Amino acid sequence: GLEETYCSMRIKENI
């Protein structure tokens, strides 16, 4: 849910 979206956003920013 919310955690999955947050993790995805973090990974995208890292790249």
Curated annotation (Swiss-Prot):
It comes from the Eukaryota. Signal peptide: none annotated. One of its GO terms (molecular function) is nutrient reservoir activity. Keywords: Disulfide bond, Seed storage protein, Storage protein. Belongs to the 11S seed storage protein (globulins) family. Hexamer; each subunit is composed of an acidic and a basic chain derived from a single precursor and linked by a disulfide bond. Seed storage protein. This is Globulin 2.
